[in-house]
Amino acid sequence: NMTPGEMADRSQYVMAAWKYLQDAAAEIGNPGLRAAVLDIMKNPAPLLAEGDAKAIMAELKGQGLLAQDAKAVFPTCASTKKSPQPFYTAPGSGWNSHHIYPGGLVTHTALNVASCKALYDNYADMFGLKLDRDVVLASQLLHGLHKPWVFQWQADGTCRKEEPLAATGEHHVLSIAESLRRGLSPELCVAQACAHD
């Protein structure tokens, strides 16, 4: 039996999508933002989990953003400095959703990045609209940055079940919170949030 990592490594589609994403990140003009995005893609570690989880959980429960019976606010992780799995091995979502296979996150994200690049170009060509291309690229590249944490592969071949947080899937909130924690711009974080419902 192959591990999820071995499956992703052997998939020409996953590896092509992973290279496409790295190349897209290299197109970001702002050197600081480019370095931050590439660093996150290399190791999407949950730095935000370094906070006081009990206090965060109490605050979220108090505001009705976390179920009162929730036992934790964060998925488990052996280290806040190292992602539980590489970005390119994570699924795109959980069971009964989309891209639920090793490497699904990168194929899903590659399609979104290609689509946003085309949309950016089309608006510029048709209407002369000049958006911040760096924000467009970075927000799409990072929109699911904590799927490797949330959708960890389990020993039985399934992935961890996503829990609700703030009336949506926890990867949405945790990914945006991570960008804020890492000091990325408010414009980027808003664009990243707009990549979700």
Task: Cite the ranges covered by each PLM segment.
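Extreme N-terminal leader/anchor segments
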Residues: 1-26
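Low-complexity, serine/threonine/proline-enriched polar segments
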Residues: 19, 23-27, 31-35, 39-43
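Short acidic/histidine-centered micro-motifs embedded in hydrophobic/aromatic stretches
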Residues: 40-43, 59, 63, 139, ...
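Active-site flanking loop/helix segments enriched in acidic
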Residues: 48-108, 156-161
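Divalent metal-dependent catalytic cores for phosphoryl transfer on phosphate-bearing substrates
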Residues: 93, 103, 107, 121-197
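Divalent metal-coordination and catalytic microenvironments
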Residues: 112
